Amino acid sequence: MKCIQIEMSFTDEYGQVTRLNKTYKPSIIEEHKGEIPRLLLDDFKRFLSSLGFNEKQVSRIVTED
């Protein structure tokens, strides 16, 4: 199994872009098999929290079934 690389980015109201590049190792992918969308969502929420979004805003982000 290969690594998965993702890039998350956010552009604020002033046009400033903040990016996060992340690589998931095969062991993490295997550990979360069947839950990859949830893993990505959780990491995206942590990314937004690190940018200063409050918990209430971030908690409203959910996946569709």
From Swiss-Prot:
It comes from the Bacteria. This is SPbeta prophage-derived uncharacterized protein YorO.
